[in-house]
Amino acid sequence: MFIIAPERTRELDRLQKYLDKLGQPYRVFVTNLETDLDQQTESLATFFTQKDPASKVGKPLFFNDLAVPELWECWTLGITTYLFDGEERRANVVLREDILSRTVDRVEWFGQGEEIVSIDVYNRYGWRSKRSLLTEAGQSYLDIYLNPQQEEVLLHFVSQGTFLLQTPKGRDRLYASKKELQRAVLEQVLPEDEAVLLMDKALLDVVKEIPKERLAYCASNAHDLDEIKEQVSQILLVEDGLLREKKDGITVLSGLVDVEQESFQPEALVMTASQEVEGLSSLVHQFPQVTFHIAALTAMGPKLTDLATRSNVRLYPGISLDKYEDLLSSCSIYLDCNQGEEVWSSSLHALENGQVLFGLKSKVHHEAYKDLSTITDSVEEMEQQLEIVLQQPEAYKELVREQARILKLPEKEALEELFKRLEGGTA
């Protein structure tokens, strides 16, 4: 599978997870200029700067290993790190997301008065992959993309929108726009015998030479797809597809769960935009053996914060996306009994992570959930259903299968067959 995406997004992450569940190998090409990419992903910039597979071997650069002039030092104050020449600060060192690792994301070089005049970007393999020169207003006017030997390979003249490719043989080439650069690179990287999964409809004209039978378009929802359907063999819904009426040529990936890979853990998740979560306090007290993870995008009201004293409660106000993803993968129970709108399509994500939905018919966020045996009329009935699962963990997988059957979630075998046809050009 060859995935073409405009950038790394949540939808791309979800598509990759679905393909992983199906055991489908894939490569990713993002049509932007990122330089900090994993080994299976390439961009317009890395296509030119990382030709050698050895360029994708290494680890992030430790801040003390930065190459600086003699007698210069790297100083750290808390999470603030900078380069010091003995008299004054010469640069900020911005660390990667895992701050405790003390590895370098970028270096912001100062001119006069600590005004940032250029930025060096370091990738996950430990070498400088990009340098940006800035105007007095702090905007980049020239982006320079480097290879591991620190040779300038691709120059982006930002204000003009042009690109200059510098080759070792001196046969430099000018691209008048990013679109021209995209087209030139894609013509070289498009596979001859792989299925192509396109996530950017603006590039449909670029991939028109790909046989329709090997081309699929990945969408986040089912809106405004009629024109695209005529140009591809399949449309794959990766985000907003659960519970929709089935349509020819449109395949839902969202909700896919591999039941055999799941195992029961007495961990429950509720994602809420309101402090009104019916029955939550009773459940917390009734089931001390279950850890309840309560998450929200904002601060929490007292009805939730008052539960913090319970040993089996964990609160996550202002939860990050990464932590949310961690909880989805570690919990086996999802509570859909909160008032207000659903956050982040969390019940759907819970389903595809093998969580059993428990909730109240008066509160569930999708009408079809009311057909599930674990969605009840009262808190007392919900507690009885939860008690059964806790006493008989072997019932967990059967409940997950029941959910998939009643909600008509994607079937792994059917999707495996679909991708097999795409790869073979018979879809």
Where are these regions (language model features)?
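N-terminal subdomain of nucleotide-sugar transferases
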Residues: M1-V68
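Repetitive, compositionally biased segments used for assembly/scaffolding
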Residues: P69-L181
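Nucleotide-activated donor-binding/catalytic signature segment of Leloir-type glycosyltransferases, i.e.
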Residues: P302-I319
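Catalytic binding pocket for nucleotide-activated donors in carbohydrate/polymer assembly enzymes
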Residues: I333-I406
